[in-house]
Amino acid sequence: MAIKTYKPYTPSRRYITGLSSEDITAKPSVRSLLVKLPAHAGRNSYGRITSRHKEAGAKKLYRIIDFKRRKFGIEGKVEAIEYDPYRNCRIALIAYKDGEKRYILQPRGLSVGDIVAAAESGLDIKPGNAMKLKNIPVGTIVHNVELKPGKGGQMIRSAGAYAQLMGKEEKYVILRLASGEMRQVLAECMASIGEVGNEEWANITIGKAGRNRHRGIRPQTRGSAMNPVDHPHGGGEGKKNSGRHPVTPWGKPTKGAKTRCKKASDKLIISRRKGK
């Protein structure tokens, strides 16, 4: 997929880059798989901001994605490759032989006309197929990995993401994530073969503030530009710094301090990500 540049008709367009849409099929989405999600804009049920720098953004419809991939024994044909406003990878519309249609994440190399299937075992190792981890050969690249059998894929779903199956141990398999982390996952969990497509997403330049506003991202004010009552970095004469190590608005260390809480799943992490 090619990176697209724009002529600088205005100063804001000079550095903008985007992704070409040549891989997208020119046909409307399946209406039965579209649903309207409420825009919370970072507010809770009381209307108070619980997640800063968020807004509704441009209007969009959510595509219902089949993350579970448990339609066993029925082959499907890729009918279309579509844009999804809620995620940074493309999605593929699968038309199954029994007449049902579902969306899945498009892995790299999957195109219109390809045949995909899901089963517990016995499928070809090709992009788009899905099997239980215990039946996938060691060394295979996978994505959309479940953490609990039957719950649906929770890991490795964004553009260009992948993991490699490194080994098998009784009821667990060992995955190496793109970050370098090695972790165990239950062997009964499902996973899709291949790497998530649209890997060029990481190389685009947003280029202007308005483009982030369309995505629902509001501006972020520096703490040093606030008053002392609003932020630990606030106050002072001119652009004077706060004289302390960088902290969040609530006084917790930032810029590298570890904030991850201990949880029961820590025992499944064999080695942490690179450099950590």
From Swiss-Prot:
For bias kind Basic and acidic residues, which ranges apply?
A: 230-240
Presence of the UniProt keyword Ribosomal protein in the record: yes
Any keyword RNA-binding? yes
Task: Extract the signal peptide range.
Answer: none
Q: Where is region (Disordered) located? A: 211-276
According to its UniProt entry, one GO biological process term is: cytoplasmic translation
Q: What Pfam families does the record tag this protein with?
A: Ribosomal_L2, Ribosomal_L2_C
Q: Quote the PROSITE patterns the UniProt record gives.
A: RIBOSOMAL_L2 (PS00467)
InterPro entries per UniProt: NA-bd_OB-fold, Rib_uL2_dom2, Ribosomal_uL2, Ribosomal_uL2_bac/org-type, Ribosomal_uL2_C, Ribosomal_uL2_CS, Ribosomal_uL2_dom3, Ribosomal_uL2_RNA-bd_dom
Keywords (A to Z) from UniProt? Ribonucleoprotein, Ribosomal protein, RNA-binding, rRNA-binding
One MF term in GO for this entry? rRNA binding
Lineage top rank: taxon: Bacteria
An annotated GO cellular component: large ribosomal subunit
Complex and partners: Part of the 50S ribosomal subunit. Forms a bridge to the 30S subunit in the 70S ribosome.
Function noted in UniProt: One of the primary rRNA binding proteins. Required for association of the 30S and 50S subunits to form the 70S ribosome, for tRNA binding and peptide bond formation. It has been suggested to have peptidyltransferase activity; this is somewhat controversial. Makes several contacts with the 16S rRNA in the 70S ribosome.
Name the HAMAP family for this protein: Ribosomal_uL2_B (MF_01320_B)
Stated family: Belongs to the universal ribosomal protein uL2 family.
The protein in question is named Large ribosomal subunit protein uL2
According to its UniProt entry, this protein's organism is Campylobacter jejuni subsp. doylei (strain ATCC BAA-1458 / RM4099 / 269.97)
